Amino acid sequence: MYDGPAIIRVNDADHGARVRLTGHLDPIDGRYHWRGMVSDCALDPTLRLPQQVSVSIEGRTSQGQLTEMTPWGTHCVAGVGMPPYPVG
C-alpha cells in the first residue's frame, strides 16, 4: 500500500496529487492489479472518463486509467502490471 504524493500525467500535462493505492497479484491472470484514489489534484472537471494516465512516485512510473470521479471530487485510478510504488 502507498499513501503519499504522486505526479499524475494526463494529456501531456503533469499534475501534483496525493494518492492512496493498493494492489494484489491476481491468481487467475497472474498479473498485479493496483487501484486507489487520487485527491488534491487540479484536473479539468470536464475531463472525459475513463482516461489514460501515468502515475509517477519517486521515479517509478506506471500506466493506468482514471475510471471515475467521486461525489467528493476525487478520482479513482486503476492499473495492471508493475505499480508505481514498491511492492514488498
Per-region residue spans from a language model:
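Solvent-exposed edge beta-strands and adjacent loop segments
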Residues: 1-29
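Short, compact, well-ordered microdomains
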Residues: 54-88
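Charged, amphipathic alpha-helical segments
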Residues: 30-44
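Short acidic, gly/pro-rich beta-turn/loop elements at beta-sheet edges
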Residues: 29, 45-48, 65, 87
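Beta-strand elements of well-folded, non-transmembrane domains
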Residues: 10-12, 23-27, 40-42, 59, ...
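Short, ordered beta-strand-loop transition motifs
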Residues: 25-33, 67-74
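Short conserved beta-strand and strand-loop elements enriched in small hydrophobics
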Residues: 4-10, 49-59
